[in-house]
């Protein structure tokens, strides 16, 4: 019996593919591959090449060494032989060829789908017109959270609840150095989590160019280095994401305004920043720039968080105004001018002047250039691709996932949708259930929600009961000397089952997943109250909020069970 040590496997399906590859090597009688142990136990004929074994595994993107021998790099020339033995990932076993899957895009949905499809035995062609990695790692989640964190630290140096004992200072902010640090981490993560993974997987072919449908079975790709290529497919996933939407305000397009993309890579901090919009992106970046030293004015068409429980918008608005951020509710710009380096915004309440303008009113699906009609793929009036719970479009073998659909615009939703689309494309049956989907807004205090608000429950005919616990009842908040915010629990009347949680609190995003699991497991509020929660954690606030349905928590000792 020969034993190989294998590194790089991430699941049982990986082990299954390694087993299949090894058993195609001449001389291998059987292979028992274990993902948890990282080993392969082989029954082989005398004279079987050990290099052939390790190269077969390497062809799948993993590394293998003989358990009783030092690693060897002597694999030159063997990869071509291995391709003949195992079919080179894009050749069939027997008379069949692998399923040909095309993925358009390279963000969260696209990557998840590509990796799952390969795991299921397909060959994937991934088409990307721009930078590998999509919005999240390049111009979205990652750089924005780095900027927000830096701004938070600057804010704490300027003022904190402990200024009486720790002298406040005015931080010297070098935006260019912060930007260099931010972009270095972006590039590091893009390579580690996207480019490196794609380069190391022989079953994925990356095509750099812009795709459009030719018909229901093929795409025309305008290659970035010139020319065009037709790419045929058995299954296709559209995962092209979304881009900042720009409202039709007279004069706006003629001005040098920012979207979030430009704001995140600017190496300067405007003295005065006007923000059109009250989207998640608008609010996160508005507070970040304010904390880094800009005078910020937000123009909100409605109130902040107007689609959510009213208490959320009230709490965040109060927090913003306390920091000196101007929040102008029910205010729209009717015209934008840029004169002598200054933006002038005309509103119903007078003019607003600023050195820079950020437009963050939402995001629009990247679907206009795809020629969806050529493949019979339906989209709604906003350009979002219409899909069912299995991510199928109106053309059954064409799928879509992520921000190019009408799914909630979160990268973890996109990735989950991409994975399930790949399962369905390769013969499985998977649906995306968003009934317990968490959402987090990285303002300070943070906003975190899951499940129903009271208004949403009533709209669906569900009778509710609710309790709101202010943070001056949460020991962690008291110890922090920061009691801004609240935790609200919504339950189904009668059953007592938890159906929704809304939280406004520092690090609210760190407590919401506990609420997700409680809702997913159909826990009652009493069952939640009976659980053990560690003392002096913010998530303990969930237990205290649950206890308010049956008792006055103000009358409890610090850590009463």
Swiss-Prot record:
Signal peptide, first to last residue: none
Gene assigned in the entry: merA
EC number: 1.16.1.1
Binding-site list for FAD: 110, 130, 135, 145, 211, 403, 411
GO annotation, biological process: detoxification of mercury ion
Transmembrane segments: none
Pfam family, one: Pyr_redox_2
The protein, known as: Mercuric reductase
Span of domain HMA: 1-65
Cofactor(s) of this protein: FAD
Subunit structure: Homodimer.
Catalyzed chemical reaction(s): Hg + NADP(+) + H(+) = Hg(2+) + NADPH
Disulfide bond residue pairs: 136-141
Cofactor note (record): Binds 1 FAD per subunit.
Binding, Hg(2+): 558-559
GO molecular function: flavin adenine dinucleotide binding; mercury (II) reductase (NADP+) activity; mercury ion binding; NAD(P)H dehydrogenase (quinone) activity; NADP binding; oxidoreductase activity, acting on a sulfur group of donors, NAD(P) as acceptor
Source taxon at top rank: Bacteria
